[in-house]
């Protein structure tokens, strides 16, 4: 019953997306690209939540909050390094599926089905890619994209990490629902690991 209610919350929470043509009009738990994190967290909370990354490029700062919501286990945000306003360039909410990727796939398919109804006119596709942090190629991102003409996107991913990556970073398999600005997406695809 909780899963059904959580999916309904997710669906009703994103219905405004159907008429939006700008990624900043989309929200996850009321938060969106272009918002200041200061609208949701204190500066102390932000500074105390900065996390290291496996990215070689340090253009963006990552923070994570594990005070989940009714549906999500936690949130991750990226903003430009030294940005005193902490403007959100990317955000994602996640659910952990420790060593249980099959359940992640089931939840991903449920969310994709519902979101696809809302995004009828936006290019969407599924793609499995190797995770850049794992040079062995054993960690996979099973991604579903909704791409906007601006270059921004919405992603619904199941991240399936290898045992090596789990040991190195303590990353567990998870579902992520995320928003990325076009600028952040360009950085992620072309600069982040160079």
Predicted regions and their residues:
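Sec-dependent N-terminal signal peptides
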Residues: 4-17
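Non-cytosolic coordination micro-motifs
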Residues: 20-62, 90-194
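Compositionally biased P/S/T/G-rich terminal and signal peptide-adjacent segments
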Residues: 64-87
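Sterically constrained small-residue positions within well-ordered secondary structures
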Residues: 11, 68, 82-84, 135-137, ...
């Amino acid at each position: 019953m909780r899963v059904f209610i959580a999916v309904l919350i997710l669906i009703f929470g994103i219905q405004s997306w159907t008429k939006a043509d700008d990624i900043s009009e989309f929200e996850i738990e009321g938060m969106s690209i272009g918002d200041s994190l200061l609208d949701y967290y204190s500066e102390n909370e932000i500074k105390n939540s900065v996390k290291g990354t496996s990215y070689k490029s340090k253009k963006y700062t990552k923070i994570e909050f594990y005070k989940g919501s009714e549906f999500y286990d936690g949130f991750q945000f990226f903003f430009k390094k030294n940005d005193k306003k902490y403007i959100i360039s990317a955000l994602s909410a996640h659910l952990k599926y420790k060593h249980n990727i099959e359940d992640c796939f089931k939840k991903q398919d449920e969310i994709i089905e519902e979101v696809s109804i809302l995004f009828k006119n936006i290019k969407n596709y599924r793609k499995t890619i190797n995770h850049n942090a794992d040079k062995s190629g054993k960690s996979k991102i099973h991604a579903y994209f909704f791409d906007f003409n601006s270059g921004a996107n919405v992603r619904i991913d199941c991240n399936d990490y290898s045992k090596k990556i789990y040991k190195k970073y303590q990353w567990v398999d998870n579902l992520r629902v995320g928003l990325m600005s076009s600028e952040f997406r360009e950085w992620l695809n072309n600069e982040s690991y160079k």
